[in-house]
Amino acid sequence: MTVGKLMIGLLIPILVATVYAEGSPAGSKRHEKFIPMVAFSCGYRNQYMTEEGSWKTDDERYATCFSGKLDILKYCRKAYPSMNITNIVEYSHEVSISDWCREEGSPCKWTHSVRPYHCIDGEFHSEALQVPHDCQFSHVNSRDQCNDYQHWKDEAGKQCKTKKSKGNKDMIVRSFAVLEPCALDMFTGVEFVCCPNDQTNKTDVQKTKEDEDDDDDEDDAYEDDYSEESDEKDEEEPSSQDPYFKIANWTNEHDDFKKAEMRMDEKHRKKVDKVMKEWGDLETRYNEQKAKDPKGAEKFKSQMNARFQKTVSSLEEEHKRMRKEIEAVHEERVQAMLNEKKRDATHDYRQALATHVNKPNKHSVLQSLKAYIRAEEKDRMHTLNRYRHLLKADSKEAAAYKPTVIHRLRYIDLRINGTLAMLRDFPDLEKYVRPIAVTYWKDYRDEVSPDISVEDSELTPIIHDDEFSKNAKLDVKAPTTTAKPVKETDNAKVLPTEASDSEEEADEYYEDEDDEQVKKTPDMKKKVKVVDIKPKEIKVTIEEEKKAPKLVETSVQTDDEDDDEDSSSSTSSESDEDEDKNIKELRVDIEPIIDEPASFYRHDKLIQSPEVERSASSVFQPYVLASAMFITAICIIAFAITNARRRRAMRGFIEVDVYTPEERHVAGMQVNGYENPTYSFFDSKA
């Protein structure tokens, strides 16, 4: 009994220690690797993951409900200042988080299930996936594609549905992970594991196992060889991929793009040097063989030339392809940043208008409106610069890109006009802000945009193209309550509405929230017709009112190039008139600049009567020249008089004193009896 009690006393602590050792890893495994994550829920304060593995509420009241990707990236950097946050990615599943606080701060008692965002620290590394038995691993990766997390999740599901297991079972996605990032929360591919819905029948496997042993051995050998080759390829691909594709540094995007181009050119130069070195070795071999076997040497030379040309052409094609990939990624990142800036500027402008209702603040509204105009104009300038670059680099791609340029330039002006139209709900604010904003818009465009209407630039072909001239010409019908002016000939050529709709659908990526605001405004309904601009004369009837000029009706008279063209244009204009009768016509207050030529004619954009300005400048030109000549004559006469006076003053003789002031002083002292002590000293010595 004593021995038994002693054994029990020794075994109990051992069992307790064993249970604790087995249980402690399970409990601490949750916090074994810290993952920086942030979570958002509108109406509540943001939360972020601490290093202990618990969710913490943000202390700031205004840090709430972020939806833009750039805002989320900035918040990640703010929540984790010690980390190098370079990108974000949605978490793979929703997480239930408790203790959500209202924006006011308390109480903190709500629980929500949200999908947090993983803040990528440093270089992006894809998650390692486990492949269970009877499951298959696969991946989809293309540098030409750049899509978000949800797209690659759906793509993984589609790929697994097309696969079959060994037992001819349908397969589903077990796990997946996105691959290399190409932009903010955008990725180039996905890797996934597909598993069968049901486990395979073990009895069937045992029956066929003995018959298929030999085949399995061969398949295993083949799979080993294939895996070795694929491993070699996988090892080569990351080394050849430029770091620019892996990490997106939004603050230094332009510098990173230039460095990536330099690295790409350096790699291409090294490859060409290597080929030239091989060519030199082959040339030496050819010369040696030519002395021994001339026919064989000529055959070898022809093969060598063909191989060399093929190698050089493949290197050039690879270099062009890599350059296009880098430019495409750069364009996408820049456009994403521009869209994010426009979105932020629109949000600030609307918030300033909402604040102005309770607390008038004209300065804040004006500053936010200027910031929005700057964001739109930067997008416009970027579009023009990209088109100019494509004209120099690839004319075919530039021709394909031209409709997008037309669409973007048109909608940039429409969005800015729609933003200005939001001021109509505040008459006092509109009277103060609108003239300043319109003047600032014109001055800023004059400053940042090239003078395309005068300058002989690369955009000249697109300016003189008829299709490009259609981008901002609007024919807006007046309400039925106004007096109808006398109609003139209207041979305008009207584009079908289906074309404009398809154009909008093709470029939804560049749409902004301002378009939706304009469309949703109840007292604004307009019929827009895009008209060819080759006018002989344009007559505009303007109804004068107290607040703003209102465009009543415009009639355009175009040149007659062809009889067929005239007939088609007249029929199209008649059909449009019939449609206008069936549509309820409402008044639309628009800027006078809309009825002027397109936005790229920047001098005429914001001037209602450019003829007056031109006539005024021609009248004052002689006066300016006469005043300049008069001032020049006065300057010449004054210079001549001054020069004559100087010459007159220089005439005569000037007495020159050969003695220095010291010598004159010593001579004066000697006259008064002064003797040099040095001389007297030497006289006494002698």
Swiss-Prot record:
Family matches, as Pfam families: APP_amyloid (PF10515), APP_Cu_bd (PF12924), APP_E2 (PF12925), APP_N (PF02177)
Disruption phenotype: Larval lethality during the L1 stage, with the formation of vacuoles in syncytial hypoderm, organ morphology defects, and molting defects. RNAi-mediated knockdown results in a reduced body size, transparent appearance, sluggish movement and insensitivity to touch. Delayed development and a molting defect that begins at the L3 to L4 larval stage transition and continues through to transition from the L4 larval stage to the young adult stage. Increased sensitivity to acetylcholine inhibition. Increased pharyngeal pumping.
Segments forming domain E2: 240-440
Gene: apl-1
Assembly description: Interacts (via cytoplasmic domain) with feh-1 (via PID 2 domain).
Transmembrane region(s): 622-642
Region (GFLD subdomain): 32-125
Bias (Acidic residues) ranges: 211-239, 500-516, 558-567
Motif YENPXY motif positions after renumbering to this chain: 674-679
Membrane topology type: Single-pass type I membrane protein
Disordered as annotated region, ranges: 201-245, 479-526, 550-585
GO biological process: axonogenesis; body morphogenesis; central nervous system development; ecdysis, collagen and cuticulin-based cuticle; nematode larval development
Disulphide-bridged cysteine pairs: 42-65, 76-119, 101-108, 135-195, 146-182, 160-194
Outcome after substituting residue 254 to A: Reduced heparin binding
UniProt domain E1: residue ranges: 32-197
Endpoints of the signal sequence: 1-21
Organism the protein comes from: Caenorhabditis elegans
Ligand binding (heparin): 252-255, 382
Recorded consequence of changing residue 254 to P: Reduced heparin binding
UniProt-annotated location(s): Membrane; Early endosome
Protein name, as recorded: Amyloid-beta-like protein
Extracellular side, ranges: 22-621
PTM summary: Extracellular region is proteolytically cleaved.
Outcome, altering residue 368 to C: Results in destabilized protein structure
Biased composition (Basic and acidic residues): 517-526
Tissues in which the protein is found: Expressed in the head, pharynx, spermatheca, uterus, vulva, tail and ventral neurons. Specifically expressed in nerve ring interneurons, the ventral cord, socket and amphids in the head, with strong expression in junctional cells, including the pharyngeal intestinal valve and uterine seam junction, and the excretory cell and weak expression in epidermal epithelial cells, including hyp7 cells, vulval cells, rectal valve cells, pharyngeal arcade cells and the tail hypodermis.
Record-level GO cellular component terms: cytoplasmic vesicle; early endosome; membrane; neuron projection; neuronal cell body
